[in-house]
UniProtKB/Swiss-Prot annotation:
Residues 1-53 form the ClpX-type ZB domain. ATP-dependent specificity component of the Clp protease. It directs the protease to specific substrates. Can perform chaperone functions in the absence of ClpP. This is ATP-dependent Clp protease ATP-binding subunit ClpX. It comes from the Bacteria. GO terms for molecular function: ATP binding; ATP hydrolysis activity; ATP-dependent protein folding chaperone; protein dimerization activity; unfolded protein binding; zinc ion binding.
Length: 408
């Protein structure tokens, strides 16, 4: 009996332990591996992956290099681009410092960023461009879809799941990624006084976000949705994730005006001329954001404040034509595949920009306006073999005439 039992005994092909010495042995094609060797392999892979991630971060572009990258894709907002370049560089420098230092005397805080600016001013695009230039996982979340745990809506941990998915479930990469939370102004408290009722989408969500922004080990449901007691969770440390939050903060300029006006009355001094909304945006301080409805603890975790300016007609025309992936260049490339040249008159570009401003859509509305103008042209051109050039005029943008077609 003993001989038969010995013949049936299964041994791990790697450490040589038998099935009675370990908890589990997994059988492969003529090969066996025990649970202890699996755990050891996972730890080795984890350490090597972490080293690879840190090596990538060591090559973080310097602020001037980041600014050059942003300038290739983003028009205007020079002050904001400089602030972002410095904040992002310092963030990844902090990670390298923390991972490699031997002493624990200096605790470097994260440079999370709050971007304030009107719709279509480039908040999301700036964050996307930064993440792409750094080759780190990037996720976008909408604050309006978030609610406190226990209420119908999306838990804040689902933001982390999006980042994990963007990292192809490589947790080490995800832990050094960037998350952009849009519409953050929509979860502001409805007033400075604390309500006795539950604030499902306001202060409660800010408190929930606060935990993951400042750094915590969060439990994330791998399939998303609500947490269940028996569900297996993904553990992710958020201390090195860079959070960029943004919002339009409509009406905050009135808070700034009130604060600046009070100073004039109080001290009898002439304040510097502030003639437009954009100038007021440059004057925003933490006190104004708190009055708008973000709680002090939340504001305190967003030390870098970047206020974007309202884009002008000239800015939007530059956005249409100058960046590497400018919309005009994209449509010119599309028509070139049909052997047709595309040209926009200067006043046509200005008319497109003016429409975007009238619609209050900013840069994000430019594509839909061009689509309206170009739809019939793009429908007809593939069937018109004699057309060599299309010229878009102001009249075509205004809907008063068709684009001009030139033939050979």
């Amino acid at each position: 009996m003993a001989g038969n039992r010995n013949e049936e005994m299964v041994y791990c092909s790697f450490c040589g332990k038998n099935q009675e010495e370990v908890k589990k042995i997994i059988a492969g094609n003529g090969v066996f591996i025990c649970n202890e060797c699996v755990a050891l392999s996972q730890e080795i892979i984890r350490e090597e992956t972490a080293e690879e991630v840190l090596a990538d971060l060591a090559e973080t572009p310097k602020p001037k290099e980041l600014l050059d990258i942003l300038n290739n894709y983003v028009v205007g907002q020079d002050r904001v681009k400089r602030a972002l370049a410095v904040a992002v560089y310092n963030h990844y420098k902090r990670i390298n410092f923390t991972e490699s230092r031997e002493d624990n005397d200096v605790d470097l805080q994260k440079s999370n960023i709050l971007m304030i600016g009107p719709t279509g001013s480039g908040k999301t695009y700036l964050a996307q461009t930064l993440a792409r230039s750094l080759n780190v996982p990037f996720a976008i979340a909408d604050a309006t879809s978030l609610t406190e745990a226990g209420y119908v809506g999306e838990d804040v941990e689902n933001i982390l799941l999006k980042l994990i998915q963007a990292a192809d479930f490589n947790i080490e990469r995800a832990e050094r990624g960037i998350i952009y939370v849009d519409e953050i102004d929509k979860i502001a408290k409805k007033g400075e006084n604390v309500s006795i009722t539950r604030d499902v989408s306001g202060e409660g969500v800010q408190q929930a976000l606060l935990k993951i922004i400042e750094g915590t080990v969060a439990s994330v449901p791998p399939q998303g949705g609500r947490k269940h007691p028996n569900q297996e969770m993904i553990q992710i440390d958020t201390k090195n994730i860079l959070f960029i939050v943004g919002g339009a903060f409509d009406g905050i300029e009135d808070i700034v005006k009130q604060r600046l006006g009070e100073k004039i009355i109080g001290f009898g001094q002439n304040n510097k001329a502030i003639d437009d909304e954009s100038s007021y945006m440059k004057e925003i301080v933490a006190e104004d954001i708190q009055k708008f409805g973000l709680i002090p603890e939340f504001i305190g975790r967003l030390p870098v404040l970047a206020a974007l300016e309202q884009l002008t007609v000239d800015d939007l025309v530059r956005i249409l034509t100058e960046p590497r992936n400018a919309l005009v260049k994209q449509y010119q490339t599309l028509l070139s595949y049909d052997g047709v040249e595309l040209e926009f008159d200067q006043d046509a570009l200005e008319a497109i920009a003016s429409k975007a401003i009238e619609r209050k859509t900013g840069a994000r509305g430019l594509r839909s306006i061009i689509e309206e103008v170009m739809m019939d042209v793009m429908f007809e051109i593939p069937s018109l073999e004699d057309v060599t050039k299309v010229r878009i005029t102001k009249e075509a943008v205004d809907g008063k005439a068709a684009p001009v077609l030139e033939t050979a």
